[in-house]
């Protein structure tokens, strides 16, 4: 019995040794400027960043002037029972918010829990911006065996520091503006040890402030909705580090 227990412990240690660290927890929030309790979700997201938590945030607007085909698709994909609803790597939903108080204390435990889960994938990217043409070259690798199938690579352009008066708030952050190449994502099927490069492109609206945009890339099991790995790049970092 002792030998079996030691073997199980050793096997568990090996799994964590060979697993890939999780870069970031992807936090997606279904929200809308018409929603009374959505300020708490927005403040919670802002507080995660302000406190240095390892997150990439995407706010998917629905039913307002910031909603678009991309945010509506993500909202429909999760099909939340109410707004706001926050998802942590596609899982562990927090439904509801607050009109005046941050949801940070509700969000933090879920971030901590997901960040402790190792990944089997890595993602890196470079980019170029030619006028309004944004081109992303994403490299995905699977250094360890993984049982997930139906995996999609999603690439989201978010904009922050948008001055807008809503529900007692003065700005919007992490607004889902664009998904490359579209809201459906790109199929990823890799053998263990394999690496693949994906070219993603789209058109940036010149009305957006490109200097406050981020690019968020993540791999998601389209069936279970679990996000397997996520990274983010500020616009300047993506362009400079080629």
Which residues are covered by each model-predicted region?
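Hydrophobic transmembrane signal anchors and adjacent membrane-proximal interface regions, especially
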Residues: 3-4, 24, 113, 238
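Short, conserved sequence motifs used for protein processing/export or organelle targeting and
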Residues: 43, 53-242
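Bacterial Sec-dependent N-terminal signal peptides
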Residues: 1-23
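Local sequence-structure signature of Cys/Sec-based thiol-disulfide redox active-site neighborhoods
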Residues: 20-56
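Generic hydrophobic/packing signal
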Residues: 17, 29-31, 85, 134
């Amino acid at each position: 019995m002792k030998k079996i227990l030691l073997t199980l412990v050793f096997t568990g240690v090996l799994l964590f040794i060979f697993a890939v660290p999780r870069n970031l927890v992807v936090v997606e929030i279904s929200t809308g400027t018409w929603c009374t309790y959505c300020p708490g979700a927005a403040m919670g997201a802002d507080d995660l960043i302000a406190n240095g938590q390892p997150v990439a945030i995407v706010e998917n607007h629905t039913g307002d002037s910031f909603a678009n085909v991309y945010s509506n698709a993500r909202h429909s994909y999760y099909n939340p029972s109410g707004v706001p609803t926050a998802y942590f790597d596609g899982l562990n939903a927090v439904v509801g918010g607050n009109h005046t108080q941050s949801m940070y204390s509700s969000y933090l435990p879920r971030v901590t829990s997901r960040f402790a889960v190792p990944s089997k994938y890595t993602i890196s990217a470079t980019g170029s911006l030619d006028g309004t043409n944004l081109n992303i070259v994403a490299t995905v690798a699977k250094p360890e065996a993984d049982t997930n199938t139906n995996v999609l690579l999603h690439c989201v352009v978010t904009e922050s520091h948008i001055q807008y008066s809503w529900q007692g708030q003065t700005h919007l952050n992490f607004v889902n503006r664009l998904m490359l190449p579209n809201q459906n994502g790109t199929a990823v099927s890799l053998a263990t040890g394999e690496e693949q490069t994906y070219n993603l492109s789209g058109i940036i609206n010149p009305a957006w402030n490109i200097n406050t945009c981020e690019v968020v890339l993540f791999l998601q099991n389209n069936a279970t909705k679990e996000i397997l790995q996520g990274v983010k790049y500020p616009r300047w970092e993506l362009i400079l580090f080629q």
